[in-house]
């Protein structure tokens, strides 16, 4: 028999079909040109001063630290096995291993970045062992500093600093007698008979490994992702907790771009990234592979089955089972901000392609404090550094709830929270207090037939503070003098709280005063001498000085955690998000079509509920809107925890 197929003379063999990455055919298979290579080299040179590449010496140090940690895990598991009288043959091969995930596993970590790690143990080692005997073993290591266990977290973790490198270690116990060296965590069968905490702990590694297996060229993917992550951080849209995207979500968007342009290199992929996602028809989901059902009865993202999934505005679905939406925190405002940034990025990268701009322009930070005319400033304060660290973490995790509430106001088009926090000026120089601020930019909508806009935000701010205080008390975190403050400032007044180098523009204006007067237990009257207002009562506070103004404040709200912030008599500003049409600004026509997901129904965003406001041009009365038929509903008292 002939070893090869016989063909007719002169006949041409059909070209082998290119491998398809992802759920659709690629948009382009074009190979890189010399100009693409030159632009990629320039991109690398531009990235270097930003510290996105780690020195070889530092990389080797990380590898050595992980080897030491891996040896500690093996030694610890062997000791546990011996204490439980396992057969010697099992003890000799019991194994155990440290896996990494996140930016380090993806190969895009920056200088000084921490390492996300997972300790995988066999079935006879449980979570209690991890948080007791392994914790004690780490405590004995002279290289280990700042060791702390967070057992009650959604994903329990041990945090430490190993020889100067911060490491977060999760734990997963597999239903295996031994842990082999070549264990592939992408194997879905490993999830059988695991508790939900182990499944959550495994998820990071499984998603990271799956992403790396789904991109055509890992080197091009990594360089593109480094550029996009830096761009997102420079443009203040890198924060999962505040409703933007986190590292894994950015990685999946870049991976999808790589799938659509499998032969492209970084300079092209960065530009195509902005092209694809500035035109993406949200809320159609971004998928790296077809979702698969494994019959393990684990909850997965599926808007056909789960009604809550239909309300996700910008779904980016993890490729590993059980599939989840990594962007469930995205709000109307954060999506608007990101889409506009995508359009800006497309316009800039086209200028770079035409040699009209350098790569450095892409990484120029926009002037957040010159972009809007109205801002809400949130301030969290605590008397000690340790309390402040916990308090700030809780407040920050709830800011997106406030943003969502502000978005429902008919006169607020957009509420843009800056992910960067700032130290706040001290209330008094001789008082020890730790304070952090966040700033939310507002785009306001002009009312019909009026040049004056009055908005009462009392209920929105009060609901936000109630939520924060209630969770702090229920989790036993709350301490006396933990406070939240809020105030409205115009752009010209930001200098009162922020230094000039942050504002990037020096302005001088008169300070205006604010008075807060509690009228009754069921209403709150704000007498305002300016267009600013703020309060910051602690849920346990009696009469004490306000954190910013020194004005008296007291425990007068039925919720004990009332904070009123309002904007009144605002002249409508000529401010809005800058809309950039990348086609008009670049003078090109987009001929590429962005593939949409077949078989996936378009999900309509939820309708905006109407909010009633009681507003006066001189004062605001706190009558929170309530559902009809529930006029007697009371806000729970956070002190009593009811």
From Swiss-Prot:
Organism: Mus musculus
Binding-site residues for Mg(2+) 2, renumbered to this chain: 114, 116, 168
Main location, first listed in the record: cytoplasm
Cofactor: Mg(2+); Mn(2+)
Keyword Magnesium tagged: yes
Enzyme class: transferase
Annotated GO CC locations: cytoplasm; endoplasmic reticulum; nucleus
Subunit: Interacts with GSG1.
SUPFAM superfamilies found in the cross-reference section: Nucleotidyltransferase, PAP/Archaeal CCA-adding enzyme, C-terminal domain, PAP/OAS1 substrate-binding domain
Tissue: Testis specific.
Catalytic activity: RNA(n) + ATP = RNA(n)-3'-adenine ribonucleotide + diphosphate
Entry's localization field: Cytoplasm; Nucleus
Site positions (Interaction with RNA): 154, 159, 329, 400
Keywords (A to Z) from UniProt: ATP-binding, Cytoplasm, Magnesium, Manganese, Metal-binding, mRNA processing, Nucleotide-binding, Nucleus, RNA-binding, Transferase
Location of region: Disordered: 530-553, 620-642
Residues annotated as binding Mg(2+) 1: 114, 116
UniProt biased composition (Polar residues): 620-636
Name the record gives this protein: Poly(A) polymerase beta
EC number assigned by the record: 2.7.7.19
Residues that bind ATP: 101-103, 110, 114-116, 168, 229, 238, 247-248
GO molecular function terms listed in the Swiss-Prot or TrEMBL record: ATP binding; metal ion binding; poly(A) RNA polymerase activity; RNA binding
